[in-house]
């Protein structure tokens, strides 16, 4: 699931569920337009692996874009986090990719606008 942020959006990233941060991995890279498919592999990014209370793994990837040249992450390995908690930001747009386990229910559709801390985007099953 990908949420694109433009320069006018709120750039704070929030945890999709409650759990413990299993690891954080920063990868330097390019600053291609975030909507391009190759940005997934080539752009600067920061991945946060979350181990949920139910044992499911959820991966949140902050991806920098053409204008966004700074990723900030406030969590580290072993941190306990709550659903909706702010964990980072991407300055001036870009995108957030969230990978849920197979079988999870996606609660939004392509083109929907979401609001941080309010919109339920998916449910773990």
Q: At which residue positions do the language-model features occur?
A:
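Contiguous, well-folded functional domains in the mature portion of proteins
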Residues: 1-125
